Amino acid sequence: MADTTGRIPLWLIGTVTGIPVIGLIGIFFYGSYSGLGSSL
């Protein structure tokens, strides 16, 4: 698994999977602050 030759770089996987997670967390906190999070 350490050999990234011919595979997707680990930093690319972390970026692609990290951005949506951060976005969802941001939307969750934004919804809770605006009062929409309580309905979820």
Curated annotation (Swiss-Prot):
Gene3D superfamilies: 6.10.250.2070. SUPFAM superfamilies: Photosystem II reaction center protein J, PsbJ. It is a single-pass membrane protein. This is Photosystem II reaction center protein J. The chain crosses the membrane at residues 8-28. It is found in: Plastid, Chloroplast thylakoid membrane. Belongs to the PsbJ family. One of the components of the core complex of photosystem II (PSII). PSII is a light-driven water:plastoquinone oxidoreductase that uses light energy to abstract electrons from H(2)O, generating O(2) and a proton gradient subsequently used for ATP formation. It consists of a core antenna complex that captures photons, and an electron transfer chain that converts photonic excitation into a charge separation. PSII is composed of 1 copy each of membrane proteins PsbA, PsbB, PsbC, PsbD, PsbE, PsbF, PsbH, PsbI, PsbJ, PsbK, PsbL, PsbM, PsbT, PsbX, PsbY, PsbZ, Psb30/Ycf12, at least 3 peripheral proteins of the oxygen-evolving complex and a large number of cofactors. It forms dimeric complexes. GO terms for biological process: photosynthesis. NCBIfam families: PRK02565.1. Keywords: Chloroplast, Membrane, Photosynthesis, Photosystem II, Plastid, Reaction center, Thylakoid, Transmembrane, Transmembrane helix. The keyword Thylakoid applies. One of its GO terms (cellular component) is photosystem II. It comes from Vitis vinifera (Grape). It comes from the Eukaryota. InterPro entries: PSII_PsbJ, PSII_PsbJ_sf. The keyword Transmembrane helix applies. Its main location: plastid. It holds the Pfam family PsbJ.
